[in-house]
A protein has these predicted regions:
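C-terminal beta-signal and adjacent terminal beta-strands/loops
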Residues: 19-23, 35, 39, 49, ...
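Short strand-turn segments of transmembrane beta-barrel domains in outer membranes
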Residues: 37-95, 104-106, 120-124
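Transmembrane beta-strands of outer-membrane beta-barrel pores
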Residues: 48-50, 80-84, 97-99, 108-112, ...
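Transmembrane beta-barrel wall of Gram-negative outer-membrane proteins
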Residues: 84-110, 119-155, 165-188, 231-239, ...
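Membrane-embedded beta-barrel scaffold of Gram-negative outer-membrane proteins
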Residues: 100, 190-204, 355, 361-367, ...
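Flexible loop and strand-edge segments within Gram-negative outer membrane beta-barrel domains
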Residues: 111-118, 122-128, 142-226, 255-259, ...
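Outer membrane beta-barrel strand-and-loop segments of large Gram-negative receptors
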Residues: 132, 218-222, 226-232, 276, ...
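Gram-negative outer-membrane beta-barrel transporters
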Residues: 293-294, 306, 445-462, 478-560
């Protein structure tokens, strides 16, 4: 039975670590995301803190003795808690037998309004239902099959930083993964398939009061269906390892904007995504050369062919009163787009690992990673018809000037089908050192123990894809610029004895738009986190208590001015701040536990510099994080 569980864990590791190509472009993220929150997977569900896009404290990394309950391989587990007036609960059942293992999980979140540090109410909230079903079959040591289904539904997700709310988001994910061969990947074929069904609806009237019947009521609906397949083969020979693979993805993406009418059918007046279909073909190879016990080199290559077609490129709406995406792209980028674009990307990464002892590891990475723009960056065709039609007569110009003053840049987000590949050329240095008796934070074999390390990254980016404003009419456009990105991370963890520990980490990031000689937008400020923790035993189990001090410096560099750039950054949110959390936990013999804490104990009023990202809000308003608040959760394993 233990061996079967090891199969399941190793199979997961294969698909998340070794199975991921080192040179894959997915490691590069957009400068500003606008997507639903991450999925709540079964391994996270029992220790999960309700997600708040306006509070970036990393409370999921705090030490709690209840984690042992949450991670135990028990047949049935429950958690339920109240977090600052919001509720989260989850149930998980899991099983394993001689040739089969599985898990079933359900979760529910009801997030409500909260007050900031000044006592002001913040219009925050959502309802979320999540679930997962996983079944694994291990007929023998050379075969494993795994079936997974994930469901995530988010309703009434308020977006106080944006002009529209996300009234409904659903994600259904079906996965099949299989292994044929040795589980240690000596001679193994892995293959699988995945289907993702994503639906979203955003509007400005379902969750907020409409001030006037004459107010524009936009409704955006998005449908996306993604099929992908992969095949990869691993071979171990003479202490070396090679993995070669192929993947194919078909992405069907539709997004429509409507003018909502109270007493008539909704009328489509723009394309968020003009019926885009994308075929992505990838081949990749990872080759690891083990020179000796201390030295190893890994070379990774990835080649991608991306063929995209905007099927509604020539579709004019409302009997031609609203122009087609082709005409919109031509107006803003001056090139006639035929609806098709084929791009190729070649990426490579070289990693050198030096492991002088079992407690030391150093790494050096040199990479050239290319990212092709996503569907919204390349094909969004949201526009304002009042601004699109140039005025000609004096009366039209007068009316246009009056409307332009109030509608500058609104409802206009124009993708760029002619974007070049984003090319990241970076060097990365990493180090990790620990004592021989260090098993983890607050976990030592004996006496005191430590771990510390860090990472330095310098990235010279050619053709970084950014959003910008067109000063003519305020429209959001997408363009390429050259940029420099630098980041430094450091961490240290020290267990003074079996009962007491401390950890500290710091991160600094610098981003410069070299083409325009200005700062990149949405670059996180310097931040330090310090945790002090204590744990001990009592007659019925264990307990812990701890504190976290989070200090964020003032961000002096940003894209603050709509007259010279995008203007997405806000000076009010660029102020520095410091907050403190206190927390504690009880564990009764690994069967029942409680987790409680007080966040922002000094009731500090502040807002995060990195704005909310559940939707693509390119002109966000300031939303303050929660003030002082309390949480209490219960955890059980049967």
């Amino acid at each position: 039975m233990k061996k079967l569980y090891f199969y399941a864990l190793s199979f997961l590791a294969v698909n998340t670590l070794i199975g991921a190509n080192l040179a894959d472009s997915s490691q590069i993220k957009k400068q500003k995301e606008g997507t639903p929150p991450p999925l709540i997977t079964p391994n996270l569900t029992q220790s999960y803190f309700p997600e708040n896009q306006f509070d970036h404290s990393r409370r999921n990394e705090y030490f709690f003795v209840t984690d042992k309950i949450n991670s135990a391989m028990s047949p049935f587990k429950l958690t339920s808690g109240v977090y600052n007036g919001s509720f989260y609960g989850s149930a998980l059942t899991q099983m394993r037998a001689s040739n089969v293992y599985g898990a079933l999980n359900f979760g529910y979140t009801k997030a409500n309004d909260y007050k900031d540090g000044a006592g002001q109410k913040v219009g925050f909230g959502y309802k979320r239902k999540n679930g997962a079903l996983m079944l694994g079959l291990v007929p023998n040591e050379l075969n494993e099959l795994k079936f997974t289904y994930l469901r995530d539904e988010i309703l009434d997700d308020k977006q106080p930083q944006h002009g529209m709310d996300s009234r409904k988001t659903t994600r259904d994910i079906f996965k099949f993964d299989a292994r044929l061969g040795e589980e240690n990947l000596d001679n193994t074929l892995s293959y699988g398939a995945r289907y993702r069904k994503i639906r979203r609806e955003n509007d400005n009237y379902s969750l907020r009061q409409v001030p006037s019947a004459a107010m524009m009521l936009p409704l955006v609906k998005m449908k996306r269906d993604i099929w992908d397949y992969y095949l990869k083969y691993d071979l171990e020979f003479s202490r070396h390892h090679n993995q070669i693979g192929f993947s194919y993805e078909n992405d069907d993406h539709k997004g429509y904007r409507y003018k909502h009418n109270l007493n008539a059918p909704d009328m489509q007046n723009a394309f968020r995504v003009p019926d885009v279909s994308v075929d992505r073909y990838k081949i990749f190879d990872n080759f690891r050369v083990t020179i000796d016990e201390q030295n190893a080199i890994l070379l990774a290559l990835a080649y991608e062919i991306n063929r995209a077609k905007a099927n509604a490129n020539d579709t004019a709406l409302n009997h031609g009163n609203f122009p087609s995406p082709r005409k919109i792209y031509q107006r803003y980028y001056g090139v006639n787009f035929d609806g098709k674009v084929d791009q190729e990307a070649l990426s490579a990464e070289l990693e050198y690992d030096f492991t002088p002892t079992s407690t030391q590891k150093y790494s050096l990475n040199l990479a050239h990673i290319e990212r092709i723009g996503d569907n919204t960056e390349r094909f969004s065709a949201l526009f304002n018809p009042y601004i699109f039609n140039n005025p000609t007569t004096p009366q039209e110009k007068k009316m246009f000037k009056k409307m332009f003053k109030n509608m500058w840049g609104k409802q206009m987000n124009i993708g760029n089908p002619f974007l070049k590949n984003e090319e990241h050329n970076f060097i990365k240095l990493g180090a990790n050192l620990k004592s021989e008796n260090y098993k983890g934070y607050m976990n030592s074999l004996f006496g005191d123990a430590y771990e510390f390390g860090g990472e330095l990254l310098l990235d010279e980016v050619k053709n970084l894809i950014i959003y910008d404003r067109l000063q003519r009419d305020g429209a959001f456009i997408v363009r390429n610029v050259d940029a420099r990105i630098f980041s430094a991370k450091a961490y240290s963890k020290y267990n003074f004895n079996p009962n007491f520990g401390a950890k500290i980490d710091a991160i600094y990031t610098y981003g410069q738009n070299k083409t325009d000689a200005r700062a990149l937008y949405q670059v996180r400020p310097f931040e330090v986190n310090l945790n002090l923790d204590y744990k001990d035993y009592f007659s019925l189990g264990t307990y812990n208590f701890g504190s976290n001090l989070r200090a964020v410096s003032r961000q002096s560099r940003g894209d603050f001015d709509v007259k010279t750039g995008l203007g997405i950054d806000n000076k009010e949110s660029a102020k520095g701040f410091a907050t403190m959390d206190l927390y504690a936990g009880l564990n009764f013999k690994d069967k029942f536990g409680m987790r409680l804490g007080v966040n922002n104990i000094f009731d500090k009023k502040y807002s995060e510099f990195i704005s909310g990202n559940h939707v693509e809000a390119l002109a966000p308003s300031v939303v303050n994080a929660p003030g002082r608040n309390i949480y209490l959760s219960f955890h059980a394993a049967f």
